[in-house]
Amino acid sequence: QHPTVQKMIDSFIEQYKGQADFDITLEAQPDSTTRDVLLGDVQNGADVFSFPDDQLSAMVAGGALAPVPNVQEVKDKMVAESVAAATVGDTLYAYPMTADNGYFLYYNKDYFTEDDVKTLDSILAVCEENGKKLSMELNSGWYMYSFFGNTGLSMNINEDGITNSCDWNTVDGDIKGLDVAEAIVNVISSPGFVSQPDGEWVAKAADGEVIAAVSGVWQAVAVKNIWGDDYGACKLPTYTCNGRQIQMASFTGYKMVGVNYYSKNKDWAFKLAQWLTNEQNQTLRFVEQNQGPSNKVAAASEEVAKVPAIAAVIEQSQYGVLQRIG
């Protein structure tokens, strides 16, 4: 993403030239470690930084984020779910940047029809018949949630913002945790299923072993290169649990741009954060990085709708929830 972001910075400097002398340094930082790096030395941290929504609570608790000043403008321009993801209590703490950080089903259309991918049972049956695999990183809690999320069972962060509550071991209700566990055992017992790290299945797709996988948009370019015109993507299927079909859930995810509470140039930092997330640059990010926009206008474009992975993550989002775990 480095060259893309640098283009945005260059256009920002051009837009505001003559109004200030800019010295903007772009440093690469994995999203997964932004929180830890910033909170480790927040007073000397970056003025402007991007991060995924599941780090927001910790950032706010650590006093790292300056509240967004132009809240109504952001609400008017961004999809509501992305604004909610950047909000704690009644305070908006960051500018939404992307709306695609969830997961869905990739599949090879050479093997599956649109009806085949509606249920996990039929997906596994096709895999078994062809000696192929459905891949999913089942030892990851992020993906494991998909089996529990739409069962009436819950897992949430408590009001303290640190501890969690979870009732997956309940003995009450139509669907119990044991029912879900038994359903998962049935899935992994299929010779058509393989659990492996998300980063490994693409290589297995390239050698023909994997023909379907639960993953996210970050693999879209690689999958398109491997499967070509047979590249398909859609919402997650239903699965069999306690004699019924249950729609698999997901964690939805959003990325955003925040401003350091301790920035010595806060006004300009807010201008840059807003610039990096405006319609123009969300469109640029989509074109060059295939990342789904949170800006309403950019997200509604025909070009976005034509990308199977983006369309799939949007379709799946109605069955997902924000990841809010301590």
Regions found by a protein language model. Give the residues of each.
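Glycine-centered hinge/linker elements that transmit conformational signals in sensory
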Residues: 163-197
